[in-house]
UniProtKB/Swiss-Prot annotation:
UniProt name for this protein: Beta-defensin 13
Subcellular locations according to the entry: Secreted
Organismal lineage: Eukaryota, Metazoa, Chordata, Craniata, Vertebrata
GO biological process: defense response to bacterium; innate immune response
Signal peptide: 1-22
Disulphides: 30-59, 37-51, 41-60
Entry's Gene Ontology cellular component terms: extracellular region
Main location: secreted
Length: 66
């Protein structure tokens, strides 16, 4: 019975780590678009996407000057 509980605990940990893979990919895309992950975009920045992390949900990029 103890081994069963260890297997279930391991599966729960794997399920919790699965969404983290998407977060890393979104952060990579944000860096590729020359942006950065922040909690809130500054007034001179625009939101170009999401990083989907708890602490840094937005991908921000500096606005181009015309």
């Amino acid at each position: 019975m103890r081994i069963f509980s260890l297997i279930v605990a391991g599966l729960v940990l794997l399920i919790q780590l699965h969404p983290a893979k998407g977060t890393l990919y979104r952060r990579f895309l944000c860096k590729k678009m020359k942006g950065r992950c922040e909690t809130a975009c500054l007034s001179f920045e625009k939101k170009i996407g999401t990083c989907r992390a708890d602490l840094t949900p937005l991908c921000c990029k500096e606005k181009k000057k015309h």
